[in-house]
Amino acid sequence: IHALNDSITLVHPEAFKLYISARSNILDDDGAVVFKGTWMRLMRRTVRDYLFRGTAAQETLAHWANIRRGEKLYISPFKDKANLQFDSSFAYEVPVLNNTATGLFNAMPSDTPRYSELQSILPAFERFEDVSPELLAKDSLLREFIGGGKYSY
């Protein structure tokens, strides 16, 4: 995660520096943002942490501000030094993760830290129809977050 940092790359000038992040916002036909890239990353992380790390959704949400702080301090300042920036967002990502993510978010107690922030995100999910994860290719990057892929982690 921190391999773009000068303290690492300056001693390895031959290294190819790659920055990967789900960065795209989803826009409506008028160009208005209907689902932010940061929400997509929160959704990915919440689903993955719940399914594969045994972490409750409210715990992921409670740590989200610290995760974002770490991104801003240790990753974002160096992303422009990458030889290649890759946006790992998928146009169909929200519909595939929608059912699992909204189930986790809706089950959170209202006294969860940052719950009010989550309430501003939940209506955005309603704009998307669910797409069955069964339709995803077994080698899809999204399988990292929902499982059922052909790779072992």
What are these regions (language model features)?
Residues 1-153:
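Conserved NTP phosphate-binding and transfer environment spanning the P-loop NTPase/kinase superfamily
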